[in-house]
């Protein structure tokens, strides 16, 4: 049997980017900090992310037909921490809205506006695949996660 703490520690040796995934809910926009993001396909343009099933926000994201994945910039540590603790991001977030009424966060390194393409079971997580309909990039350096902590490049 694999020790989960040791497994998590080993996974922490892999540097990942940090994202904030947002969607609209019946109570307004919500978000979740996630490092389980990956590109999947160029044609069609697909990305994926994996929310934990134990999260109170999991089911809302699983039902969402649209969502936006934000690549956090190196100055957005507090924003990422806020979304780790609160669905609405607390006072740290200033919501903006696109033409379709979807909430997003400005000044990220990149932003991918997606429609849900599919979802799959992934153990204690779900795997949500999104088809990218629009994206935007900036010159901001991304925030990264390594060894269980946020860090800069």
Task: Label the model's feature ranges.
Residues 1-153:
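Basic, polyanion-binding surface patches
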């Amino acid at each position: 049997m694999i020790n989960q703490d040791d497994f998590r520690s080993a996974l922490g040796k892999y540097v990942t980017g940090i994202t904030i995934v947002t969607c609209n809910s019946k109570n307004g926009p919500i978000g979740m900090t996630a490092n389980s993001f990956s590109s999947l396909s160029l044609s069609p343009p697909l990305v994926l992310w994996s929310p934990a099933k134990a999260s109170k926000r999991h089911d809302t994201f699983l039902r969402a037909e649209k969502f936006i994945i934000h690549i956090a910039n190196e100055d957005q540590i507090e924003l990422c921490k806020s979304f780790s603790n609160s669905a609405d991001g607390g006072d740290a977030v200033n919501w903006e809205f696109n033409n379709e009424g979807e909430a997003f966060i400005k000044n990220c390194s990149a932003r991918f506006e997606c429609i849900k393409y599919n979802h799959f079971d992934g153990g204690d997580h779900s795997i949500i695949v999104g088809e990218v309909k629009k994206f935007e990039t900036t010159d901001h350096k991304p925030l990264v996660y390594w060894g269980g902590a946020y860090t800069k490049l």
